């Protein structure tokens, strides 16, 4: 009986965690992160520190997204590749 109860508790915890967690890419190399509470979007946005038109991308969990033609803003797991 204790085993059944423990199994139910573990399954409940896992299901609750999976239902509320968004996973986003946070690096070009493919590292991922479970987003903190309140961060319900994944984003990939272009950053330009160069004066010749070159840019690089930043990947993150966010609550609001940057505007831009090269940017990706989405709300499903691993959508910001």
Curated annotation (Swiss-Prot):
Swiss-Prot/TrEMBL keywords: Acetylcholine receptor inhibiting toxin, Disulfide bond, Ion channel impairing toxin, Neurotoxin, Postsynaptic neurotoxin, Secreted, Signal, Toxin
Species this protein is from: Micrurus mipartitus
Location relative to the cell: Secreted
Family membership noted in the UniProt record: Belongs to the three-finger toxin family. Short-chain subfamily.
Keyword check for Transferase: no
Known role: Snake venom neurotoxin that blocks neuromuscular transmission, presenting a postsynaptic action through the nicotinic acetylcholine receptor (nAChR). Has no cytotoxic activity.
SUPFAM superfamilies: Snake toxin-like (SSF57302)
Tissue note: Expressed by the venom gland.
Signal peptide: 1-21
Main location: secreted
Annotated protein name in UniProt: Mipartoxin-2
This protein's GO CC annotations: extracellular region
UniProt GO molecular function: acetylcholine receptor inhibitor activity; ion channel regulator activity; toxin activity
Keyword Signal attributed: yes
Disulphide-bridged cysteine pairs: 24-42, 35-61, 65-73, 74-79
